[in-house]
């Protein structure tokens, strides 16, 4: 009995990544053995994602307010370089997608458009939506997971409490610590949640439906892999002047894997916060940069918008010159930063990019439908890239600031 409890204790306290790997293998095995049984355990995945999504808004709000309220005077938060990295990384992703799409042009088999979807009419509408999310009712922002509004109100409350008594600030610090403990508990349940998610995904879709779009997926995933394994490490190396791969691989392993299966940047915020804490990053920095990254750091979305738009142009025989491709990179990068402000995310911003080439809205919506077909893989890979990059760039900016402080 003692040996059994000792084994269970070791299992519970062991490597989370190994446990997640076991969950993935078990999920695939169950789905291969019995589709019905796999569908029965789908609720485990839904519960896990639901728990992360439920705690993420209050975690961000309290952590941001507490960090700013308890911030010492003249403390550097390094937010400017992080925002610059986010924007540059998103543009680099769009540019990489353009180059890869031109090297490997793809034809789409267009299907019927998605019913009941309403894409934005222009970049102005996307920015307008984002601005109004900024001044959303704070209670509504917490209820709906509007992280732009949550950040704005969290920063506002933190600044207002900056001159409050020490006991008031301590209450916020204690509540913040308590919520972080709850997050740690939820993250320990990741292997069970991912087991349910993998089993359900394989049972419901398999990969037969996506086989017809193999070349399109190869271009999409190839662009994302280049960003994750070549471009991002290069950017990090320029910032920290040392081998970037230990940091990049750790972030992909501990943040990217979870994000891949939850397919939600919002649900992955608590995971990223916990990883930043493990990396011993500045709490005043990551408490703001991680939720901000979940909103504007959208390299994966920029790739999706660019690749599908250029595939549509190639299918219709539209010639794309270098200047137009460059303009598409800029539009895709700006649109991607606003993806969180659009219901349906990156896919519903495709008609906006298609309008650059005079592609009609009807055809553009058929391209969106193709996006939904490959969404099982596209959305998962996009989220993994977006979410892991948030931690990578935050860590790079923090380390660069520390190195600068040591030198001078």
UniProtKB/Swiss-Prot annotation:
A GO term from the CC aspect: plasma membrane
Disulfide bonds: none
Listed GO MF terms: neutral L-amino acid:sodium symporter activity
UniProt cross-references to InterPro entries, sorted A to Z: Na-dicarboxylate_symporter (IPR001991), Na:dicarbo_symporter_sf (IPR036458), Ser_Thr_transp_SstT (IPR023025)
GO biological-process terms attached to the record: serine transport; threonine transport
Keywords carried by this UniProt record: Amino-acid transport, Cell inner membrane, Cell membrane, Membrane, Symport, Transmembrane, Transmembrane helix, Transport
Main location: membrane
Family matches, as Gene3D superfamilies: Sodium:dicarboxylate symporter
HAMAP family (UniProt xref): Ser_Thr_transp_SstT
Protein known as: Serine/threonine transporter SstT
